Regions:
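Non-catalytic C-terminal accessory modules of carbohydrate-active enzymes
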Residues: 1, 6-168
């Protein structure tokens, strides 16, 4: 939320004690109650930070003003060390998904919005709306509306369908 994706990546990939990486090196397959492994070894105590992977890195969230995924917000926060992220979740209306990658100076993001839902799609590193190319099932029907630039993100509103956004 504060634009500290690089720091979050470093914290999630740390291998020395105390860290999630240290737990993995100790054979953990769940989050533990304490960093040192005492007490429960299947405990949600530190699990909240794991939401960074889908909420921030992949960037798929229910709009807090329209709960239940009636309106979805796609706003990935890529970090320099990761070239792609993919996430899907079941909603009351069907599957919502995001799949982004960056290769050779090109950023591509495909989003899927369930039937009967709308979404705000924020395309990172766009710098200008002319840098973004869109394609998808709803484009011909005028289902993509450009809302403007916000913090180096080109923001769009889309209706249900599958859309691909590319930044060259």
């Amino acid at each position: 939320e504060n634009g500290l994706g690089e720091l979050a990546y470093e914290a999630m990939n740390k291998r020395d004690y105390p860290s999630f990486g240290h737990w993995i090196d100790q054979g953990a397959t769940t989050t533990w109650e304490q960093w040192n492994g005492e007490n429960s070894r299947n405990h949600p105590m530190f699990g909240g930070s794991l939401t960074w992977f889908y909420r921030k890195l992949a960037g798929l969230n229910a709009d807090p003003l329209q709960p239940g995924y009636r309106h979805i917000v796609f706003r990935p926060q890529p970090v320099s060390q990761i070239d792609w992220a993919k996430y899907a979740t079941a909603t009351p209306y069907g599957q919502a998904s995001v799949d982004w990658s960056k290769r050779g100076g090109r950023f591509t993001m495909t989003v899927e919005v369930p039937v009967g839902c709308t979404a705000t799609v924020c395309v990172p590193d766009a710098k200008a709306p002319s840098a973004v190319r869109t394609d998808g099932t709803g484009k011909k029907d005028g289902n993509i509306v450009y809302n403007g630039m916000k913090d180096d993100y080109a923001e769009y509103t889309v209706r249900s369908g599958k859309y691909t956004f590319t930044v060259e």
